[in-house]
Amino acid sequence: SRGTTFLLQGSMGHGKTQIAHDLGKRFPTYNVIILDVVNMDLGDTQMPAIIYPADGSDPYSIFAPNEMFGIHLQQPSIILMDEYLKGKRAVKASLCMVAMERELAGKKLHPKTIIFAAANRDGEGLGDQLLEHEKQRFLPVRMRNQTKEEVIEHGAHKGWHPALLGFMAEKGDLLFQDFDEISDYRDNPYPFHPQAVG
C-alpha cells in the first residue's frame, strides 16, 4: 500500500544520515539500508533477467531488484535514500516507485519497511531541488540545526575532551548558526554559506 515518504532536508553535516542508524537501534530486527543515490546508476536498482521456461516455450525477460533492497529477505527494512535530490533522473524515477508504491521491479517491499529520503537544503546551491512530479511523492520536512546546548550535552555524555566542549560553549552560537540567518558570510566563518563559494 502507499505510504508517506518524508524528504528530510537540512544543512550539511547535521546528522541526516545518522537518523537511519538511530532508527536501526530502535528497531533492531530491521535491516538498515543506506542508498548513496548520488553515486547510483539505474542498474543499481534493478536489472533485466531472462527467464527460460522449463516447458521449452519462448524465453522472456523480467526485471529483478538489486539485493541491497532486501526484498528477497522478506524482512522489514529501514531504507534511507541519501542525497536523493542529487541522483540521476533515471535512478530517481526508479526510486519514486520505492517511495510511493513500496515496490521495486514489480516486487513489494515488506509492509513494515520504513522509507525516507535525505537531502541538503535547496538554498545551499548544491543542486538539491525537488522536481514537480517528485512533489507528489515526497513530503519535505526541514531539519533544524542543533543548538550549542544540545551538542555540548551530547558531547559531555560521550566523553568529549573538555577543551572541545569549552570551544563549543564559547563559539557555539556561531558554529551552529543556520546559513540563512547570516546576511553576509564574512560575519561568520564557521557554517557553510552559498555566498562563500559563488
Tell where the protein language model's regions lie, with residue ranges.
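C-terminal regulatory/interaction module of P-loop NTP-utilizing enzymes
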Residues: S1-V32, D36-I79, Y84-G198
